[in-house]
Amino acid sequence: MAFKVVVSDTKTGKSYQFETESTALIGKKIGDEISGSVVELEGYKLKITGGSDKCGFAMRHDIHGAMKMRVLLKEGPGYNVKEKGLRRRKSLRGNTISKDVTLINTKVVEYGSAPLGGEPESTE
């Protein structure tokens, strides 16, 4: 099982995508801090901010566990309110990373010594 890990740089506003086969991410929750060495970013510390599963369902921080649920929402992640007071039942994934999750969103909390984007490409 491969995870796509999107790392957002809060200083520059850019994001970088990495792939990893690491099983160290399984069982982690939204809000947990992980080492950047999971995605070969030595010295970095990353905070998990969200993700989505293999069917495209978003993870939500207030649904505990790794299962998929149909919840009634009036606002927040996973639901875009069209009218005031409108509620809707949506399928969402829980806040724990499992083998069904394919995309993990993170942001940088502590920076390492190497630049995040690697070597800039030459424009020849």
UniProtKB/Swiss-Prot annotation:
GO terms for biological process: translation. InterPro entries: Ribosomal_eS6, Ribosomal_eS6_arc. GO terms for cellular component: ribonucleoprotein complex; ribosome. Keywords: Ribonucleoprotein, Ribosomal protein. It comes from the Archaea. One of its GO terms (molecular function) is structural constituent of ribosome. HAMAP family: Ribosomal_eS6 (MF_00512). Belongs to the eukaryotic ribosomal protein eS6 family. NCBIfam families: PRK04290.1-3. This is Small ribosomal subunit protein eS6. It comes from Methanococcus maripaludis (strain C7 / ATCC BAA-1331). The gene is rps6e.
